[in-house]
A protein has these predicted regions:
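Domain-level signal for Mg2+-assisted phosphodiester chemistry and nucleotide/NA-binding surfaces
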Residues: 1-89, 135, 141
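Nuclease catalytic cores that cleave nucleic-acid phosphodiester bonds
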Residues: 66-176
């Protein structure tokens, strides 16, 4: 989401940014922030560009794992073909998020889940978390980036104000 706006987030401040409006109404402690992602594609004989992307990925993962109360969950990047066009798709990431949310809410580890997503694939997990007694806050970007059923299902919704998001604007690399 933030790549669209050329924002490099300050992950250390992200949890407080997301919790702030909720904490105005109820006291809320942070169990953990989970970051769901996957490593970039690497061909059998990686190009310099692929090696650079992997190095950046490893640096980010190391940074996130070093932040107190943060955990990284990695899926896999799968190479696919649509006719003659190659594309890449993240696999397992949505399932990992869903399993963690349902597991923690069912076990009573969390009373409030904060989700940054827009995909309707999360609807069953959010329903299960709510049935377990958790309140679900949904943060989303542009209106067209979120499924309306997901928006209607969440207990609380917040539209991300990119101007207040902790982070800094990065310059686009025109050579890419």
């Amino acid at each position: 989401f933030l790549k669209r706006y050329d924002i490099e987030p300050k992950y250390e401040e992200l949890a407080d940014y997301l919790l702030k409006p909720i904490r105005k109404k109820i006291p809320l402690d942070l169990l953990r922030c989970y970051f769901y992602y996957c490593a970039p594609w690497m061909s059998p004989e990686p190009t310099d560009s692929e090696k650079k992307r992997m190095e950046e990925h490893e640096h980010l993962m190391e940074h996130l794992e070093g932040i107190e109360r943060w955990a990284v969950r990695l899926g896999k990047l799968q190479r696919r073909w649509d006719g003659y066009k190659e594309y890449f798709e993240q696999k397992r990431v949505d399932v990992l998020l869903s399993v963690d949310m349902v597991r923690h809410s069912a076990a009573g580890h969390i009373q409030h889940a904060i989700v940054l997503a827009g995909d309707s694939d999360f609807i069953p997990a959010i329903e299960a978390a709510k049935e377990s007694g958790a309140t679900v806050s949904l943060w989303y970007g542009e209106d067209n980036s979120i499924h309306k059923d997901l928006l209607n299902l969440a207990d609380i919704t917040h539209k991300i104000d990119i101007r207040k998001m902790p982070g800094k604007k990065v310059k686009k690399d025109e050579s890419k």
